Amino acid sequence: MTHDLIEKSKKHLWLPFTQMKDYDENPLIIESGTGIKVKDINGKEYYDGFSSVWLNVHGHRKKELDDAIKKQLGKIAHSTLLGMTNVPATQLAETLIDISPKKLTRVFYSDSGAEAMEIALKMAFQYWKNIGKPEKQKFIAMKNGYHGDTIGAVSVGSIELFHHVYGPLMFESYKAPIPYVYRSESGDPDECRDQCLRELAQLLEEHHEEIAALSIESMVQGASGMIVMPEGYLAGVRELCTTYDVLMIVDEVATGFGRTGKMFACEHENVQPDLMAAGKGITGGYLPIAVTFATEDIYKAFYDDYENLKTFFHGHSYTGNQLGCAVALENLALFESENIVEQVAEKSKKLHFLLQDLHALPHVGDIRQLGFMCGAELVRSKETKEPYPADRRIGYKVSLKMRELGMLTRPLGDVIAFLPPLASTAEELSEMVAIMKQAIHEVTSLED
């Protein structure tokens, strides 16, 4: 049966963000999971070192979450949210508003983080039209930014490897610099931050009359390599958006729900977004639910008699699905009863200490961390910061070695991403970092 399943997967499946030639050479099929480990069809266990793409909170098969889904199944699995609502979607909306930045008063459900961002872009665009400023149609995106894979989200993204092929499909956006301290000329966080803010201020000064919104990941640029923003940068962006009357869209899809040691990462700098996208950890990693938060001011710009054509015409079939909302409610109840955010903040200190051990490795150039979002950047030369040639695929080789040693993750180029489930114990964190260290050492030693 094992061989048969592998052959079927090779014959029929097309996996996301995967060169299928690589999969054919190194196939993997997961069968089950318990706690922070998953098991493949051969019975081998692996630490879930990237939280099943940055979303698992409590581990796999958390009884309370399993039971919440079963209980909701006894009532109804799904009904539409078009023109009506349902019980768990309504209850979840109230809970989400209670835990979100105080100026956000409305939630719009969707199925993925990319769609949540797409919705935010469309809301921002239509907001200005609805209030009589249709000339504000353009967007500012951050260099190296990533917001998902729909055409709108790609248009405000800036990762060449992912996005260049779709250039003719994308709408044009202005690109603003982001402080990548390790690769900056000075290497000084304050200087790097201030220079980037000056360039953003100049861009806004020249173009604010045509700009609807700025989109930015919250505190950490994830897909570009776990780039942690220097203190004061996100707050500085908020101040500039306010000064130049530009909406601020904050992407909390990866960073939200405790991942950075705050419920939402923008809380680190007391930033109040105009629109905010969230997803991933909202259901504890169980079902696909996402949400776009909006201020009351934005909501009211759409609230009018139907004939005035201010309705927000967006929505998908499974928006506000009861099973997803029910498990999200239980997930957030566990956040409170188990003090998840406080625990992550405390365990992050232990994790920081553990990660410092990687600095001793000759090809680890930089280690970046905010909460349970971590990245180790591998370089050919630690002294010059020279990267490995892309065709060496060092990050990919390290991830395969980690799999062999009993831990799953996915590299971001030559940055080894480490985003463990929030429920990971200190002992489990120590074991996972040890696997990272061994894999990096073994692979880079062979590449010298």
UniProtKB/Swiss-Prot annotation:
EC number: 2.6.1.105
Assigned GO CC terms: cytoplasm
Uppermost EC category: transferase
Sites bearing N6-(pyridoxal phosphate)lysine, chain numbering: 280
SUPFAM superfamilies: PLP-dependent transferases
Residues annotated for substrate binding in this entry: 146, 315, 410
Cysteine disulfide links: none
Activity regulation statement: Inhibited by 7-keto-8-aminopelargonic acid at concentrations above 80 uM.
Subunit structure: Homodimer.
Official protein name in the record: L-Lysine--8-amino-7-oxononanoate transaminase
The organism of origin for this protein: Bacillus subtilis (strain 168)
